[in-house]
Design a protein with these regions (language model features):
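A beta-strand edge to alpha-helix "cap/lid" segment located at domain peripheries
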Residues: 1, 54-130
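Residues at secondary-structure transition points
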Residues: 1, 5, 43-50, 96
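Generic alpha-helical hydrophobic packing signal
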Residues: 7-8, 22, 49, 53, ...
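Short, charged low-complexity linear motifs
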Residues: 17-20, 41, 89-92
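Short, flexible active-site loop motifs that bind/organize anionic cofactors or intermediates
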Residues: 9-12, 42, 114
Length: 130
């Protein structure tokens, strides 16, 4: 499986809520981070492999994902970049919004060794605030 296919498989597993499958694609020393200033969203911050399930748990506990569409994906030998349209409704506030996500994936020996995700942090803060 190539790197783009691996990222697509991760996205399919995310859509199915299958964190165990996602974990199988990660190297033991993965450096995982949803990069953002502040801590308004519980999925923000850097994580080790052991902490990655908490990233997905925080999303599942707080959001109903209403749209997840890969708009563009490109790769070189080690990296995959993806642009995603993401729609969400925050369970606690009932507020909904849509944004563009940017994901950078780096691979070594077929495993994810680095993930960086960015999102519209201002919109996220607005949606999470009652």
């Amino acid at each position: 499986m190539g790197n783009i296919e691996t990222v697509q498989a991760v996205y399919e597993a995310f859509g199915a809520g299958d964190v165990d499958t996602i974990m199988g694609f990660l190297a033991d020393d993965v450096d995982w981070s949803a990069e953002a200033e502040g801590t308004v969203a519980p999925w923000y911050g850097r994580r080790t492999k052991a902490e990655v399930p908490a990233f997905f748990q925080a999303i599942a506990e707080n959001l109903e994902v209403t749209d997840f569409e890969v708009l563009s994906i490109a790769a070189n030998d080690t990296d995959v970049m993806a642009v995603i349209r993401f729609g969400e409704t925050v369970k606690r506030t009932g507020k909904s919004g849509s944004m563009t996500l940017h994901h950078w994936w780096r691979f070594r020996d077929g495993k994810v060794v680095l993930y960086r995700g960015t999102e519209d942090t201002a919109l996220t803060a607005e949606l999470l605030t009652p």
